[in-house]
Every structure is written in structure tokens, then in C-alpha cells.
Amino acid sequence: MTLEFPDDLKYSDSHEYVRMDGEIATVGISAYAIDQLGDIVFIELPEVGDSIEKEEPFGTIESVKAVEDLKAPVTGTVIERNEDILDEHEKLSEDPYIEGWLLKVRVKDPDELNGDDIYSADDYRKLVEGE
């Protein structure tokens, strides 16, 4: 997989990404995180209507290498989850930014994306190249 980091996204240091469209955030996992995890075998996501809190776990992802918490890059209410990836884990590695998104969240405070713990594509690339 080519490690791409689209410029229209924001990234967290726990390797989740956010694509904003008005007050709706599409949340997923970066190509870097998926590459590090290897083959995904299980994903647990919150239900529609659940609240998620920035920097708090909202689900888990299990691979052949590890089990990791998914941490919320924003605070808000889940309005949609990508049911397809629960059964078709390969969508995460094939297309993490379009087909492999995890959640759509109605964001409580969009200014959360302006903090020091949220990165542009260029800054995120520098972060992961240093790991």
C-alpha cells in the first residue's frame, strides 16, 4: 500500500483522520496506521446515536499483530458508521480514505481541530517519518 496522506484531511497523533464537511466529520484510520497493523481481523465501532469524546477510545481494531484502541479526534454524536468495513476489512487497506472510513460524526466543537494535537498532511507525514 502506498502511504498517502490527502491534504484535505486533518490527522491525530493516534493516527485517526478527520474530513470535515460543514459540521459533519468523517473519521477513519490513516494509511500509515493500517500499514503498521497489518491484516485486520476485527473492528468494533460505536452505534449510531452514541457520543464520542475527543482523545477517548471509541472502538477497537484488531490485527494479526495487535489490538489497538481507536481514539476520537473530535467530540460529537455518531450519525453513521461504515457497516461495510465490519465484514470487509480489506477496504481499510485498499482505500482507507474513501471506502474505508469508520464513522460520520456531528461535531460538537469544530475548533477542536485547531489544537496542537491535530496535524496537517505535511506535519503528519513528518510525524510518521520520525517513528
From Swiss-Prot:
Q: Which cofactor does it need?
A: (R)-lipoate
Q: Which Pfam families match?
A: GCV_H
Cofactor note, please?
Binds 1 lipoyl cofactor covalently.
Modified positions (N6-lipoyllysine) are: 65
Top-level taxon of the source organism = Bacteria
* Keyword match Cell membrane: no
Q: Which GO terms describe its cellular component?
A: cytosol; glycine cleavage complex
Q: Does the keyword Protease apply?
A: no
What sequence ranges are listed for the domain Lipoyl-binding? 24-106
Q: Name one GO biological process term.
A: glycine decarboxylation via glycine cleavage system
- Keywords per UniProt: Lipoyl
Q: Assembly state and interactors?
A: The glycine cleavage system is composed of four proteins: P, T, L and H.
Q: Which family would the database say this protein is a member of? A: Belongs to the GcvH family.
What this protein is reported to do is described as: The glycine cleavage system catalyzes the degradation of glycine. The H protein shuttles the methylamine group of glycine from the P protein to the T protein.
For this protein, the record's NCBIfam families field holds: gcvH (TIGR00527), PRK01202.1 (NF002270)
Q: What is this protein called?
A: Glycine cleavage system H protein
Task: State the gene name recorded for this protein.
Answer: gcvH
